[in-house]
Amino acid sequence: MNKEICGEDENKKSDKLINRYILRGRKFVDYACFQYGAYNAAISGEADANFIDDYQYFVFTKSTKSLETIRILLRNDKTEDALIVLRSMFEGYLASRFIGEKYDRKLLDDFIFFPQIIASNKTYYNKQNKKHYLKSNNEALNYKQRNPAEMIIGKDKSYYRALYDYLCMFSHCNYAILPHYLDENGFFDCDGKMDCFMVKILVLFIYTKIFESIVTVEGEDFFNIREESECYKLVKDATMY
């Protein structure tokens, strides 16, 4: 790892924060993440707002697993590839916040039920009117797939465009990032060229937002007071960092 670029002391601090997030994130998944919406629907026969928890816990679990992957990539100087994974994490944060703050029953169809139906190959797509239809009875699904720009809320608008465009450059084959795949002599090279410390800052920024919006929210259950204190302290330390 290029310590001259990263700054060894700051690099260690950021590593410790990432490690702490993985530890607390995994614990939260184990003791708190449960499909409350699906459980209640199985009993009552109706879908309700508890599915918001299901979706947000899904995003949190997926993001925590992605954080572990990013840690492995960064340890192996695959910084550009870490940004590819980070883009998916950022999209998850936007969707999770959107469904939580803009909830209505229709969003459950768009975010949870219709995607499952479509993925199970129970529909066909009409290119002319751009709609999905059930194969069983030709009924149209009133499905809206939102792009990330449609789910920005509040202060996220102030930085979304710059951050998302930057992440997209690395997840697409954008020729603007060519220098990251060349050595000092202009030959193609698979070794990392990016400032790994900058990438870690972006990782901490995005995962902190996910952790803060799902874990350290009013009414969330912790299995003991110490765990609650550690989670709030972690968010504070990462934010101040």
Language-model region placement:
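A cross-kingdom marker of C-terminal helix-rich interaction/assembly modules
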Residues: M1-G92, S96-Y241
